[in-house]
């Protein structure tokens, strides 16, 4: 299920702006049709506590589906704090975390992965164009 609206906003706000309010039950039903039939990847927009439907957050959808989540954080200054806050939020909602991915947009010399691994036992993967084959190999081990 892919929802596209003209307004660049949260899915909740965009759906209200378009006159087609999006309800959590609609998202759950669209996703559950696929669960058990094949590999299911559900991409949220924003973070764990970002609105995704009328009066619903990404965390509500994740909890309803019961699928493991992947936390993706831009690999930059502040990434460790952002990742740890997201991990804490997911844990408080009793969501299963498959891994954290540090997504490197621009080459950097930060040691965010090493720092993050010191604070969590959750697998931490690093993605960059230069390391894409290694990333895929590590990700396949988790699936």
Please state what every model-predicted region is.
Residues 41-43, 70-72, 101:
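Structural motif
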Residues 11-52, 59:
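Phosphate-binding/switch loop-helix module in NTP-utilizing enzymes
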Residues 87-143:
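C-terminal lobe/tail of nucleotide-utilizing enzymes
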Residues 45-46, 76, 105, 128:
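Anionic group-transfer/hydrolysis microenvironments
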Residues 53-75:
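Inter-motif core of Ras-like GTPase G domains
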Residues 1-3:
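Short, small-residue-biased leader/transition segments that mark boundaries at the very start
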Residues 53-60, 84-87, 110-114:
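Charged helix-capping and loop-helix junction motifs
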Residues 73-81, 85-88:
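Active-site beta-alpha connecting loops in nucleotide-dependent enzymes
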